[in-house]
A protein has these predicted regions:
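Nucleotide/phosphate-binding catalytic cleft detector across ATP-hydrolyzing
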Residues: 1
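C-terminal or late-domain output modules
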Residues: 173-181
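Phosphate-binding glycine-rich/basic clefts of nucleotide- and phosphate-handling proteins
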Residues: 14-174
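Short acidic, Gly/Ser-rich segments with clustered Asp/Glu that frequently serve as metal-coordination loops
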Residues: 6-11
């Protein structure tokens, strides 16, 4: 069986394979591998959708919990403005996009990478409680302008000049992620 998770679809193909030795009739080492397709199906759930789910369910949820723990009673309005679908000035829209590319997507991909090695029988989870910064160690550090875009409004709302999104822990529950699939 082959599973191909692409950007737009996930495709499943199940083949049987046989060897064709041609005129040699089984002697020698030259043979053709002949596939016979038994099943093929495609699904509209793809890699981009899975990454989006990880960003929503893990990264943004951890950000929301982190803001509540930092003292922000209702993080929804500020998050809606910073990372929601509200219309922004062109410069802020670009920074929102860069926040996703430099912070949210790499963390989502890191969670998916950890999930690839997840064994439901072992229940190992080496990511839970690591900070945004720790999960971004293997990629280029986010730019100051991107960090300022998210940190400054939150600092003002919290009255805490030292707030930094990179210090927040990420709550990763691989068992829960496993149950979603």
């Amino acid at each position: 069986a082959t599973v191909d998770i692409g950007g737009g679809t996930t495709d499943l193909v199940i083949n049987d394979y046989s060897l064709d030795y041609g005129e040699n009739g089984g002697s020698g080492s030259n043979a053709y591998i002949i596939p016979t397709q038994r099943f093929r199906d495609g699904f509209k759930v793809a890699g981009d959708d899975i990454l989006l789910d990880m960003i929503r369910d893990v990264v943004v949820e951890s950000l929301t919990v982190g803001l509540k723990n930092a003292g922000l009673r209702d993080p929804e309005p500020i998050l809606s403005e910073l990372i929601g679908d509200q219309a922004l000035k062109v410069q802020d829209a670009l920074l929102r996009q860069q926040l996703t590319l430099q912070v949210f997507s790499p963390i989502g991909l890191r969670v998916l990478k950890e999930y690839e090695g997840y064994d439901p029988m072992q229940k190992n989870n080496t990511l839970n409680g690591k900070t945004f910064s720790e999960l971004l160690e293997d990629v280029e550090k986010p730019t100051e302008s991107v960090l300022d875009y998210i940190n400054e409004p939150i600092r003002r709302a919290l009255g805490n000049a030292n707030f930094n999104i990179l210090d927040l822990p990420v709550q990763v529950n691989l068992e829960r992620i496993h149950s979603l699939f």
